[in-house]
Amino acid sequence: LRHDDIHLANATGEGNLVVLFGARTGGDGIGGASILASETFEDGMPAKRPSVQVGDPFMEKVLIECCLDLFEADVVQGIQDLGAAGISCATSELASNGDSGMHVDLENVLLRDPTLTAGEILMSESQERMMAIVTPQDRERFFEIIDKWDVEAAVIGHLTGDGRLTIDHYGHRIVDVDPKTVAHEGPVYDRPYARPAWQDELQAATSESLARPATREELIADVRAVLSDVNQASKAWVTDQYDRYVQ
């Protein structure tokens, strides 16, 4: 991809369409520690289980080739992948970068799991999804290329001139914010900090001032202490237990 063919994550042009394409939206990446901290696991309650997002290499390859075709046809005004925080992140960053407003109708999102709530749809981290800004004039050509690669897509919103990010779910307004406050002007922590006293002592130490093992047993003990330190020891007992196929 030539540098002059790079498309940025900017949403500009009032009336332009917001298109979500690629894989369908599921429950991937929702919950995590907040679910484990919940005390509500009663029968009859909605299932509370985190779902680890698992990539699909074939779908990823198809989506890459599809995007390259879209770029070559010059039917994309702006584009962004969906990663952490999913739709909530992509919409706010696109609108903020382009100094634009955006309206989204969340019910138009293609779902893999129809039981997802509005909040879950917004925060889903399902892989292999892209969000593009397309002019109404390029809509037909855009979807021709999408269909050629057998990729699913849906128009979920449009750009506005009011500078607000608004998101509705079946007529109910669930988001109405300035996108910059979400994407780039969020709260910044001003945490107290100080230089640790032990750093001065450590940096002042020399090879002559450090204790050295005098016997074989002391040397073995020192080596074992280093190897058993949590920063040095094998992490396999944790990583080998992690099930990345949790559904």
What are these regions (language model features)?
Residues 1-247:
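Glycine/proline-enriched, intrinsically flexible loops and inter-domain linkers
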